[in-house]
Amino acid sequence: MAKSNEEPNSNLNTNKPPLKRTKTLAQQPSLNLRVSIAAADNGIGNSSSSSTKTDFEQQQRNYPSFLGIGSTSRKRRPPPPPKPSNITPNVKPPASDFQTKPHSEPKTSPSSSSPPSLPIAITKQQQQQHSISSPIFYLFVITCVIFVPYSAFLQYKLAKLKDMKLQLCCQIDFCSGNGKTSLQKDVVDDGSFSYYILNADSRTISLYIVLFTLVLPFILYKYIDYLPQMINFSRRTNSNKEDVPLKKRVAYMVDVFFSIYPYAKLLALLFATLFLIAFGGLALYAVTGGSMAEALWHSWTYVADAGNHAETEGMGQRIVSVSISAGGMLIFAMMLGLVSDAISEKVDSLRKGKSEVIERNHVLILGWSDKLGSLLKQLAIANKSVGGGVIVVLAEKEKEEMEMDIAKLEFDFMGTSVICRSGSPLILADLKKVSVSKARAIIVLASDENADQSDARALRVVLSLTGVKEALRGHVVVEMSDLDNEPLVKLVGGELIETVVAHDVIGRLMIQCALQPGLAQIWEDILGFENAEFYIKRWPELDGLLFKDILISFPDAIPCGVKVSADGGKIVINPDDNYVLRDGDEVLVIAEDDDTYAPGPLPEVRKGYFPRIRDPPKYPEKILFCGWRRDIDDMIMVLEAFLAPGSELWMFNEVPEKQRERKLAAGELDVFGLENIKLVHREGNAVIRRHLESLPLETFDSILILADESVEDSVAHSDSRSLATLLLIRDIQSRRLPYRDTKSTSLRLSGFSHNSWIREMQQASDKSIIISEILDSRTRNLVSVSRISDYVLSNELVSMALAMVAEDKQINRVLEELFAEEGNEMCIKPAEFYLFDQEELCFYDIMIRGRTRKEIVIGYRLASQERALINPSEKSMTRKWSLDDVFVVIASGE
């Protein structure tokens, strides 16, 4: 029985570790562990996890350290308990333990006492062993790949040495002493390093190198992520921190290299070409009988021309040459791709407007709005006299989109080139890209945002312009949306800044047109470059003349004022007749173009006898505002200055009355301090008929249809509301006419007659004046086709003013005075103030008669014509005048 118990021990001892491990196991209290395992197999109890862990730790200490298993630097999971058949024979427990305690169970923790933990522990141990053995396996594979060819090379070299020894022995036996000396010298030469490189057997080494180079990328791609583990294993370090795989890091570095360096693709192509030539030359050297230099040359020819391999002979040489030719085709395809990408990128850069503009004395427009079309048109007309010019547009839009929008204008630019660039006016680099410092004029357009945001952006653009290191050559014209923001922009920009407050200008012009019908057309002619416009020039030959003589000195122009040099360049419009032109003074005129007029000899004029009629007194008027503008408080102040006492201003809009009072008070308007007008509030929608019918529309002298503040951001919506309100008001007025005859009624009853409806609206227009604020010039045809309204083109007039100030910044002061409620103003006067009916006079005679009223006559409109003529060409030609004719004058507002 004892013998049978010792046999298993002897078998086990043949496979167990050294004696140290056996001694260590004997010293540990592992009896309970073995009993528990045996009991677990018999259904008696479970194993103890704590004792298992202790036994596993003792086993770890006995493994060699280079395997990394016995390291205590990292906490390892305990291995599963060994099978009872292998453990129970090792240490035989006393029989008394089995007899006295047949059902005793060891004390175990609740977490480790469950039987299912054994398979999990076995699986984890297998995974751990696999993770440990994998780097060793990969290292073994790589070592074999590297050293197997090298061992073959050493064997080859050993064989060569043996052959050489045999040859030397044979030659020594049959040669003389002198031959022996020379033979030893030859042997030494043949045994040099160049011998192994140049002899035929060195081609085998080249073949091994080629094969190894072909296999190496696949091995690296497959197992490169295990390289850090091998390094840690060689350094005997263990790191638990998670790291990015090496394959991803390499891909990231390549990506960064190609992204940062602009010539990375070209360098990569050059490296690939050189590598293919060298690799192909080495392969050709291995399969052919030529030299290395010849093989490299053939490799280059195969890369450069894929057809050169057609005459090769031999299977190996053909395979190599075809492979090199295929690589050469790939190289040239990559080269063509790079060239194509470079050309496409350059063309795309030009197409997207990223290139630099190298121009001088050009007009630079910053921003994009619906006013740009009419602005370009006016600037092109202004440049017509000089054979055209250059206009550069910088906006935050795509260049193609801007060019398409400009092409839709269908306007002949008459030699003017329009260059579009995509960029932000707030970025200095983009401003330098359009040669901002060399522009003769810079126009900053208002954005499509609300007034405060648009003016804030304009202020930032002005700050960017002031930050340009090179001094600006030209002046800056800024389109403002709110009059309150104008002083801040001028404060920041200084003397270079000229502002045009578009909203305020249109509001003042609407009031002037409402009080004097037809004035809108006159302002279009004066502000636009198609007809007559303002010019200021120095004429030394006029020094010493009185202004009344200067007035008739220009056959093709009409003098309107003087720029006084002694008063700091102040422009005086409509000066006194006795003002003497001094040295340095300049003359303000209205002319066709800046090169179409010059002073001439004084003509013969006759003042003669004419009626001395004073201006009729002003009578109270009744005016209606349909809509709400954000600067309506300024318009009320202008009306307060123009209207007679007792006038009424009706305000009809959707803004509640209390909110109106708060807005007017915020605009610093004292409603109770108004002396000439009385405010009447009505609430309603101007596009709803029943709301309009509640108003006495037939009693108003003037009706102003304003672009409502709620829809002013949308040009189409605003114009649609204005047009609908205009038609509704005219229709309501025509139905309320007291002199409507029965004929028109029968026409409406028998069937709708468009002409009769238009005729009734024209009759209503004779009773009251309607001024519509139209934002889009295309809406002009819808309003002017029936002549039912005297209209104002807001964007058209603002664009004209911007273009005129861009051409000459001094004109801005002239426009400011003519638009103001004080000082000189543009007026339309009847002919009875200057002549008798059917009197024959020349235009010079009428100009002299106008000076008696302190007025400057600049044009006229005949009763038989629809449009006024400003700056007539033949001023000395006499003609008959009618009392139905009217004259356009610049008169003092005092």
Swiss-Prot record:
Cellular compartment(s): Nucleus membrane
Molecular functions per Gene Ontology: identical protein binding
Bias kind Polar residues: ranges: 7-16, 24-33, 44-63
Keywords from the named record: Coiled coil, Ion channel, Ion transport, Membrane, Nucleus, Transmembrane, Transmembrane helix, Transport
Membrane topology label: Multi-pass membrane protein
Coiled coil location: 390-415
Effect the entry attributes to changing A306V: In sym8-2; loss of function
GO CC terms, sorted: nuclear membrane
InterPro entries in the cross-refs: CASTOR/POLLUX/SYM8-like, CASTOR/POLLUX/SYM8_dom, NAD(P)-bd_dom_sf, RCK_N
Region feature Disordered, mapped onto this chain: 1-124
Gene3D superfamilies noted in UniProt: NAD(P)-binding Rossmann-like Domain (3.40.50.720)
Annotated RCK N-terminal domain residues: 360-501, 620-769
Transmembrane segments: 134-154, 204-224, 267-287, 319-339
Signal peptide residues on this chain, from the entry's feature table: none
Single biological process term from Gene Ontology: monoatomic ion transmembrane transport
Note: Can restore nodulation to a Medicago truncatula dmi1 mutant.
PANTHER family: ION CHANNEL POLLUX-RELATED
Task of the protein: Required for both rhizobial and mycorrhizal symbiosis. Involved in Nod-factor-induced calcium spiking. May induce a change in membrane polarization that activates the opening of a calcium channel required for calcium spiking. Might be calcium gated.
Family: Belongs to the castor/pollux (TC 1.A.1.23) family.
Assembly information from the UniProt record: Homotetramer.
Protein name: Probable ion channel SYM8
